[in-house]
Structure formats: C-alpha cells, structure tokens
C-alpha cells in the first residue's frame, strides 16, 4: 500500500484545554511527570499499545510512534480556559485527585498554566459560579475573543500547531434544530444574532478552534460539533473533529461487556446502571437539565450493540417499546467520594428456554485517572489526523468516546462495540503509516 502523505510532527504542539479542573490538571500533571521520568502514562494507547503490521513471516508489532509520526510529549505546551482563575497547580491541589508527592515535583510547570478567561453562560451550567469570564455581549463576540486567545497563545509559545479539547462541565441539553444547526450560514447568523437558546458557549469554542486551524475534540456529551453546521465548517477548514463524551468507567465496561451478551446470543431483559460521583462534574450533573445531556449519551451505548430489530427474540421488537429490554442510567452527586466514582450495573439476562440469570458489576474507579490518558491520545491522534489531511468526523477515534459522532442525517449508525472500535482505530493507524487495513470490523 502506498504510504499516505503525513506531515512530520515538527515544532511545538499547543494543547488548549477548555476547563482546568480535575481531569485537565490530572492530564497535565501526568504529562509533566512523565517527561521528568517520574511517572508512567499508564492507560495511554499512544504510549503503550502495539499494533500488528504485516502478515505471516513479515508480521511485527509496533508502537504507534513507530508506524506514524506522533508529537513527542516534550513538545507539548499547555494552555487552558476556566471560569475559576486558579492556576493548574492550585486547581490540582483543590481537586485532590493526586497526592501532593505526585504534584509537587512539577509545581513550577503547573503554576505557569494560568487559565484564560472563559466564554461562559451560567444558564448552561447553573451550579458553577466562577467569575473568570469574558465580558462578551453576543455569541459572535465570544467567538472573536476565543480566536484571539488561540492566536495569542500560539504566537507567545511558538507553537507550530494547536489542538483544542473540551474537558469542562456538561452543558444543558441543546436539541438539534436543523433551521439553526443545519447549515454553517444559519449557525453563523444565529451567533451574530446572539441566539443564546440554540448556540451554546461550547459551540463558540469549536467554531473558534476550527477557524484558527485547530482540531476540536468534545469530551462532554454536549451537542456542540455533532451538528451538520460544524461538519460543514470542519470540511471548509479541512480540520478534524471528534466527540462526544470521554468513555471512562461505566460506559467503557458497557461497550466491552454488551458484546459478550450479543456474541453468545443471550437475551437481555434489562440493564440498570447507577453511579455516585462527588467532584465538580458530579455537582453540575446534579442539575436535571445538565444530567439529561449525559443521560442521552450514556443511554446510546447499548442500542447499536444489542439491536432489538436484529434479534427480536433476544432484545425485543424494534417497533414495540413494551417488548424491548429496559435500560436505565442514573448519576448521583455524593461529595464524600470526590473524584472516586463508583458504578453499579445490574444486568438481567436470559438463556436456554428463557431461564433468567443476573450479572452484577461494581466498578470502583477514579474518574480523572481514567480520563487523563484519553485526553493525551485524542489530542495526539487528532493532531496526527490533521497532518495526514483527514478532516471532518474522525470515526476512528470512537474507541475513546461514549457517544461516537456519525452522520445521522443519512441514517448512519454509530459504532459502539468496543472491539469493532479498536479495529477501526488500528486500521486507521495502519493506513496512515502506509500499511494495509487487514481486519474485519463486522
């Protein structure tokens, strides 16, 4: 296979993180500590995973960086926006995800990461009360201010390239309105008209990033780039976009475990998932309007893996909700746990002759510890995609995301099956490295 024309990863890579909370500071601290040889980036596919290339006697297993030109960790420069003014060191200490002994060796580096004023609308995250916000009269002013931030950061830090990733709170749910979100022209008109109902602040970040030549990744379940207008902008600017919602704990388990049920042709009566979480993310999600955005994302995982219309005897009849399996997701704000999220899953299945069985999963995880490597992989791979000339929705990044983006206007279904997603990821790396894609995904 002819090798793709992938530009080398030369110069500094600026990673601008929207949000300087638990996830962002855990990510930054880990990168800084790894650069000093004081920690290992465990959980990062780009740093640890190996992909088979070639077949038979010619096969070999290589790290991603030995197949494609990835940015080096030493070339990363961090920037951030946040509604709170504390620098990354102060924010990391406040979050209490990491121990002081794992933060203090890179205190100097973290203290240099000072949040720029955020483009913020309290109506989209009512539980947040920070005052480090831009004084913008309209959504279009937000866009212009954010574009200037990106230009200034790039120039000040001598960055060759920029990637923008959202690690801020979940916004209230914004349903897709094709009159506003259907075309780029309509979205721009809404921004200039200050349509605050249909244009979320996150859309201003995405618009600013793409127009400044930076890939944009949506790490929350926000609608943001999951609209035709943003797909059009990504195509116009030739920039990659990815989303939605980092796949960390319960959704990771679900996307990996549901295929076991489906592959074994077992039936499903119901799947009940509940979580407790005490960090700032949990606080925001305690607001019903914000939780609904997350609920839509978390509920989407099962329906494309265990399809009622494909196996009505096992998963119910597609047009009759009364016969489909019952799927419920809940998140409860519980401050004593802070970032240490706990998830419970009760799965009611049935087997031979319809006899019932149950599966119980109890996952005591650390939300930011699971999320941090996703930020690293998504930013490095989005930068790679841009240098490879890939633009628009990056489906190969579905592996890292809870509600993978897809062109729903054409009836396309997302791939939520973890092992199919992994094959998509590997094949994209192979192709960008000049190797053949050689594994089936269905």
Language-model-detected regions and their locations in the chain:
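Glycine-rich, aromatic-lined ligand/substrate-binding cores of catalytic
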Residues: 293, 297-393
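Short flexible/disordered coil segments
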Residues: 222-237, 276-287, 304-313, 334-343, ...
């Amino acid at each position: 296979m002819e090798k793709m024309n992938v530009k080398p990863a030369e110069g500094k890579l600026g990673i601008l993180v929207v949000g300087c909370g638990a996830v962002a500071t855990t990510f930054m601290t880990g990168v800084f500590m790894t650069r000093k040889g004081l920690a290992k980036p465990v959980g990062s596919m780009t740093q640890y995973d190996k992909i088979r290339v070639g077949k038979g006697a010619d096969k070999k297993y290589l790290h991603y960086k030995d197949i494609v030109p990835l940015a080096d960790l030493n070339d990363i420069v961090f920037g951030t926006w946040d509604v709170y003014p504390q620098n990354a060191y102060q924010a990391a200490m406040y979050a209490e995800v990491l121990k002081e002994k794992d933060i203090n060796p890179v205190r100097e580096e973290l203290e240099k990461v000072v949040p720029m004023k955020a483009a913020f609308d309290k109506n989209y995250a009512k539980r947040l009360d920070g005052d480090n916000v831009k004084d913008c009269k309209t959504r279009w002013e937000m866009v212009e201010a954010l574009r200037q931030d990106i230009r200034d950061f790039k120039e000040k830090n001598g960055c060759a390239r920029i990637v923008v990733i959202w690690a801020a709170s979940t916004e209230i749910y914004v349903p897709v309105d094709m009159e506003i979100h259907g075309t780029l022209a309509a979205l721009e008109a809404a921004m200039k008209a200050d349509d605050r109902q249909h244009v979320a602040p996150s859309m201003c970040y995405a618009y600013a990033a793409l127009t400044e030549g930076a890939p944009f990744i949506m790490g929350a379940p926000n609608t943001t780039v999951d609209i035709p207008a943003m797909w059009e902008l990504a195509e116009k600017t030739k920039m990659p976009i990815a989303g939605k919602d980092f796949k960390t704990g319960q959704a990771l388990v679900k996307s990996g475990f549901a295929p076991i049920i489906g592959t074994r042709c077992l039936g499903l009566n119901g799947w009940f998932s509940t979580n407790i979480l005490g960090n700032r993310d949990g606080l925001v999600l305690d607001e019903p309007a914000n939780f609904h955005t997350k609920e839509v994302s978390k509920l989407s995982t099962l329906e494309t893996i265990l399809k009622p219309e494909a196996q009505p005897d096992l998963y119910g009849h597609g047009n009759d909700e009364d016969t489909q399996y019952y799927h419920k997701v809940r998140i409860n704000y519980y401050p004593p746990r802070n970032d240490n999220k706990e998830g419970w899953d009760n799965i009611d299945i049935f087997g031979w002759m319809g006899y019932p069985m149950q599966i119980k999963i109890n996952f005591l995880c650390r939300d930011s510890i699971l999320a941090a490597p996703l930020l690293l992989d998504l930013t490095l791979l989005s930068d790679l995609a841009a240098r490879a000339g890939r633009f628009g929705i990056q489906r190969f990044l579905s592996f890292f995301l809870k509600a993978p983006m897809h062109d729903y206007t054409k009836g396309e279904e997302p791939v939520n099956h973890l092992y199919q997603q992994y094959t998509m990821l590997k094949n994209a790396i192979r192709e960008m490295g000049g190797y053949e894609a050689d594994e089936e995904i269905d």
